[in-house]
């Protein structure tokens, strides 16, 4: 493992997940100072501490030092071990917060990862498990991460503030990743969705579907929105409802949008009709931004391109989010990889907004944790 001399130093609580995930993959220790040092409630939050505990569970030999106030963190990564794991996520953030990091790390374990995560499956902050299942899994398949043991399953739904959801994620390991050329997103051919309701009337989901279809039917006939009403113990601990929509293109690109109702006891009550209409509009905005990967998974695709074989990978993205821009800076710090960024102004009227073509040469990252069979 890298010594203290090669460690990277950062300040502040922003992008904590990015730094810890890239540290784990590159083997370079990180020291993060001044984590909310001037806040009334200084130091790491519960959900960040839970994330660090999760990293500790899936690695072997990690060294984690946190000072008394929780404002300084030193993390020396161990080997990614994998295997069967269970983890109770903090209900302050969705399971998507933890799952996004696991999607980056899972292909590089020593043993295939099989993990049960408990907590909030759908909230208003993090990508829901439904969206990650519909968009991130097909994306990983493009890089050659595929197989029977590759699945993401919602066993129970949990809405904030109580949580009570349960998700099973299993992923095979790969020695190397294939380079990709994702430059033509294609045209939208179908829209699929999931309207869910827990601990409220099942009619809520049907009302969401009708209002979402009222907008989307003007553009395309092939729309199917499933309704999912979980009962009893499968419905978690709090009431709520929401909608996730995914548009699929002729070239196998998936673009997503989602909305969830306000948590119980917080904010004004949301009408299912408004939620359905607003979510449909968000999907249309995402389609306008376009690209071969939606804005939720921009950083995931850039990471997998970086870690690919020593060959050129290209991907066409919509406008880069601030999170992705910071991620590119971190990729340069941890892996010394720079992307060629070309703006592609939109010439045609009906092709949406301006695009960005990202090109890089993979570092030929080899999964050292995986044992030779």
UniProtKB/Swiss-Prot annotation:
The keyword Transmembrane helix does not apply. GO terms for cellular component: nucleolus; small-subunit processome. It is found in: Nucleus, Nucleolus. Pfam families: RTC (PF01137), RTC_insert (PF05189). GO terms for molecular function: catalytic activity. It comes from the Eukaryota. Keywords: Nucleus, Ribosome biogenesis. One of its GO terms (biological process) is rRNA processing. As part of the small subunit (SSU) processome, it plays a role in 40S-ribosomal-subunit biogenesis in the early pre-rRNA processing steps at sites A0, A1 and A2 that are required for proper maturation of the 18S RNA. Activates BMS1 by promoting GDP/GTP exchange. Does not have cyclase activity. Part of the small subunit (SSU) processome, composed of more than 70 proteins and the RNA chaperone small nucleolar RNA (snoRNA) U3. Interacts with BMS1. PANTHER family: RNA 3' TERMINAL PHOSPHATE CYCLASE, RNA 3'-TERMINAL PHOSPHATE CYCLASE-LIKE PROTEIN. Belongs to the RNA 3'-terminal cyclase family. Type 2 subfamily. This is RNA 3'-terminal phosphate cyclase-like protein. It comes from Mus musculus (Mouse). The gene is Rcl1.
